[in-house]
Amino acid sequence: MSKPMDHVKRPMNAFMVWSRAQRRKMAQENPKMHNSEISKRLGAEWKLLTESEKRPFIDEAKRLRAMHMKEHPDYKYRPRRKPKTLMKKDKFAFPVAYNLGEHEALKVGGLPAGALTESLMSNPDKAAAAAAAAAARVFFNPSMSANPYSFFDLGSKMTELSPPSFSYASPLGYPTAATAFSGAVGGGAHTHTHSHPSPGNPGYMIPCNCAAWPSAGLQPPLAYILLPGMGKPQLEPYPAYAAAL
């Protein structure tokens, strides 16, 4: 490598002229003090000086500047800035799997996996829709995957249910007091001892001598699909009429 040209230093200003002797003195008095702390203290002391106390150093700085201009008439201040590392921003706001086209649920129309992946990577909206479709095929049965909105069409299902059929189940999946009481009276010989998970501490089981759980009280698992830009939905008690769908 070629040797760089001799660097021409900037002329000292009034503070640099004053702090040259003060820095040496403070460093001798505090040998363990860091240079940055010394500069901080010198700057605070320089601000406390009056204009008459600063005048000799200001005049000396002007003389040094005039001498510098004579010695280097073509001088121009060019600060040597450190190169900044360019941060690579993510192209997409959400991660897209590289092997998205290899999934059986995403193979459409006989397209090769590479072409499908490139088309999804070029269009984030299609990638999000494809990811949601794959998740629906995993969590739900094929009939619901073909028409995912049928699961949420509760208005049409409500008309099929008669008012007496609404047996409000417990949000925790336990049998209600009326169901347990009727089961105990109607079939007292069929009661058996079992245990429930504790609502306050899931690690413990609570023994119970109530009747067996009715089929209406069992709740199917509910899965949430989180897409980009959507927050986690608040969990609400699963209603009894939705469990009958």
Swiss-Prot record:
<dbReference type="InterPro" id="IPR036910">
    <property type="entry name" value="HMG_box_dom_sf"/>
</dbReference>
<dbReference type="InterPro" id="IPR050140">
    <property type="entry name" value="SRY-related_HMG-box_TF-like"/>
</dbReference>
<dbReference type="GO" id="GO:0005634">
    <property type="term" value="C:nucleus"/>
</dbReference>
<dbReference type="GO" id="GO:0030182">
    <property type="term" value="P:neuron differentiation"/>
</dbReference>
<protein>
    <recommendedName>
        <fullName>Transcription factor Sox-21-B</fullName>
    </recommendedName>
</protein>
<keyword id="KW-0678">Repressor</keyword>
<keyword id="KW-0539">Nucleus</keyword>
<dbReference type="GO" id="GO:0045944">
    <property type="term" value="P:positive regulation of transcription by RNA polymerase II"/>
</dbReference>
<keyword id="KW-0238">DNA-binding</keyword>
<dbReference type="Pfam" id="PF12336">
    <property type="entry name" value="SOXp"/>
</dbReference>
<dbReference type="InterPro" id="IPR009071">
    <property type="entry name" value="HMG_box_dom"/>
</dbReference>
<keyword id="KW-0804">Transcription</keyword>
<dbReference type="Pfam" id="PF00505">
    <property type="entry name" value="HMG_box"/>
</dbReference>
<dbReference type="GO" id="GO:0000122">
    <property type="term" value="P:negative regulation of transcription by RNA polymerase II"/>
</dbReference>
<dbReference type="GO" id="GO:0045892">
    <property type="term" value="P:negative regulation of DNA-templated transcription"/>
</dbReference>
<dbReference type="GO" id="GO:0007420">
    <property type="term" value="P:brain development"/>
</dbReference>
<dbReference type="GO" id="GO:0002088">
    <property type="term" value="P:lens development in camera-type eye"/>
</dbReference>
<dbReference type="GO" id="GO:0043565">
    <property type="term" value="F:sequence-specific DNA binding"/>
</dbReference>
<dbReference type="InterPro" id="IPR022097">
    <property type="entry name" value="SOX_fam"/>
</dbReference>
<dbReference type="GO" id="GO:0001228">
    <property type="term" value="F:DNA-binding transcription activator activity, RNA polymerase II-specific"/>
</dbReference>
<feature type="DNA-binding region" description="HMG box">
    <location>
        <begin position="8"/>
        <end position="76"/>
    </location>
</feature>
<comment type="function">
    <text>Acts as a negative regulator of transcription.</text>
</comment>
<keyword id="KW-0805">Transcription regulation</keyword>
<dbReference type="GO" id="GO:0000978">
    <property type="term" value="F:RNA polymerase II cis-regulatory region sequence-specific DNA binding"/>
</dbReference>
